[in-house]
């Protein structure tokens, strides 16, 4: 098997890259360690797409339900300071779009099933004398590729195999997320409140029938939940945000939580290997840009490869990858800092 690109990781970013390359007649395969199944989990986790990321998905034919955000109101819960952001300020119809994580992941997965190897990992890889990457899978099957794209998340398997060491820091915070019903006045507005009880964000959810459903992402210091359960913390503190928003909020899903930290690699490229999205970097969800940085990475990577192949010249893979790294690393570091 000799695909142009082998992709480690069949998540949102890896599957987007595979779909886009395949649509441009550039062969790719996806190596994914999980089983081939559509998510059975309830829709709780969401991602927020900026207009550019949504356009990238539109361009490859991904159609899923989304909620529009036209305005963001950010304010200080302890004082009177506030600031509004409107889609008018960026000459767009919408500031951003909220989609369910599972919906997006499943829609992309369906489009690349035929070129995905499930329940498989990359066991090792090396450069050969023909400037190809010799890849061995966990089932001992070989693959020869020009490019190996690491899209396998913050604990990237291929980054470890390449002995790349990330720079990491811990925010000492936990992100709590759940869905809720709320009687907010404007269904197209997202709110973010900074307070001693944490950073509380509430955004509309995709719905064809009811505009009273919202997703909540709540970042709290670990010390605040050290001596009580997350459920008890929510019960004790959500009334504070109800008063600030002048709305009633009712939790209507399970509660998910995860520790917050960031990481980045000083080099995104080594030999045939390139790190993309969360494999290369991760940031605080406060910025709401994690997935969008991943899509920007994926877009730059695909552009460089597609442009090189459309030029019908001998591909200098090291130049292609270096151009990607130059385009994306400094932009990502700006967001991290």
What are these regions (language model features)?
Residues 52-59, 66-161, 169-177:
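Conserved N-terminal helical subregion
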Residues 4-6, 10-71:
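Glycine-rich FAD cofactor-binding loop and adjacent beta-loop-alpha segment at the N-terminus
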Residues 8, 31, 151, 277, ...:
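Active-site flanking residues adjacent to catalytic metal/cofactor-binding acidic residues
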Residues 148-247, 252-255:
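Conserved FAD-binding catalytic core of PHBH/FMO-like flavoproteins
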Residues 226-309, 314-318:
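FAD/FMN-dependent oxidoreductases across multiple families
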Residues 323-337:
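Short acidic/His-enriched helical or mixed secondary-structure segments at domain edges of catalytic enzymes
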